[in-house]
């Protein structure tokens, strides 16, 4: 196991691994344990009580974070003609069709989200094996296969993000930056949590939220009480 830095060890000492923190306390602690010289991302990791190998237990969806992620997403759009012009006017970072597909086949993946008009999906299917595992494949369920490219680009640039459980039943979602006010981090978490709870498969049995952890880039994990799904701006009850 790689040796942790002194800064990491000092930050880890602030976290009581034997307790479950209220979301408000976890957000405050995430800010305290973040590296001062940078503005790291604050992320939530969840372990869900689902079996992603079963098609009816796949958890995926979108959430509009009320305070955004602190980062302007890089968005590409697969479109031609008037729709391509609309995407460019909306602020898409790259727009194209076959040329964009060839660029991605060549190894370019410098973007955070991909949108496609319905007529482009047959072509985009050529790179499904590249985009799919990275959570970048356009999908009607997440609003990224749509003729309304203007709205789709604006939504993602404004803080709309996708979430999807992985093969190990883990789910990761960004809720902001360490520089955010604590309340804003918690409000973003609340918005994400609501959507993730809403996406619970009807076939999922037992506890749905098994484990929740807050963490910052290169920071220690902070265990959060998975039972706290309401009144998230309140401290832990003693």
Swiss-Prot record:
- What UniProt keywords apply to this chain's record, in alphabetical order? Repressor, Ribonucleoprotein, Ribosomal protein, RNA-binding, rRNA-binding, Translation regulation, tRNA-binding
PROSITE patterns in the record, alphabetically? Answer: RIBOSOMAL_L1
Q: Name one GO cellular component term.
A: large ribosomal subunit
Signal peptide bounds: none
* Matches recorded under SUPFAM superfamilies: Ribosomal protein L1
Which GO molecular function entries does the Swiss-Prot or TrEMBL record give?
rRNA binding; structural constituent of ribosome; tRNA binding
Q: Which InterPro entries match?
A: Ribosom_uL1_bac-type, Ribosomal_uL1, Ribosomal_uL1-like, Ribosomal_uL1/biogenesis, Ribosomal_uL1_3-a/b-sand, Ribosomal_uL1_CS
**Gene Ontology BP terms:** regulation of translation; translation
- NCBIfam families membership: rplA_bact
Q: Mind telling me which HAMAP family this protein's record contains?
A: Ribosomal_uL1_B (MF_01318_B)
Q: Its family?
A: Belongs to the universal ribosomal protein uL1 family.
Q: What does this protein do?
A: Binds directly to 23S rRNA. The L1 stalk is quite mobile in the ribosome, and is involved in E site tRNA release.
Q: What quaternary structure, including any partners, is listed in this protein's UniProt entry?
A: Part of the 50S ribosomal subunit.
What is the name attached to this protein's record? Large ribosomal subunit protein uL1
């Amino acid at each position: 196991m790689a040796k942790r830095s002194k800064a990491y060890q000092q930050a880890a000492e602030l976290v009581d691994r034997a307790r479950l923190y209220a979301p408000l306390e976890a957000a405050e602690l995430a800010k305290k344990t973040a590296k001062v010289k940078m503005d790291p991302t604050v992320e939530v990791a969840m372990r869900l009580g689902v079996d992603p190998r079963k098609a009816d237990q796949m958890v995926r969806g979108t959430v509009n974070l009320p305070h955004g992620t602190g980062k302007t997403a890089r968005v590409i759009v697969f479109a031609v003609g008037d729709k391509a012009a609309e995407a460019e006017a909306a602020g898409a970072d790259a727009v194209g069709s076959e040329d964009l597909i060839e660029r991605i086949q060549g190894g370019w993946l410098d973007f955070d989200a991909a949108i496609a008009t319905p007529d482009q999906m047959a072509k985009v299917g050529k790179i499904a094996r590249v985009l799919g595992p990275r959570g970048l494949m356009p999908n009607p369920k997440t609003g990224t296969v749509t003729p309304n490219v203007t709205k789709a680009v604006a939504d993602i640039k404004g803080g709309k993000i996708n979430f999807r459980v992985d093969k190990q039943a883990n789910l990761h979602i960004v809720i902001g930056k360490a520089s955010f006010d604590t309340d804003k981090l918690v409000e973003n978490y609340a918005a994400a949590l609501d959507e993730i709870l809403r996406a619970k498969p009807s076939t999922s049995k037992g506890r749905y939220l098994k484990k929740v952890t807050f963490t910052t880039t290169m920071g220690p994990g902070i265990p959060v009480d998975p039972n706290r799904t309401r009144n998230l701006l309140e401290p832990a009850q003693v």
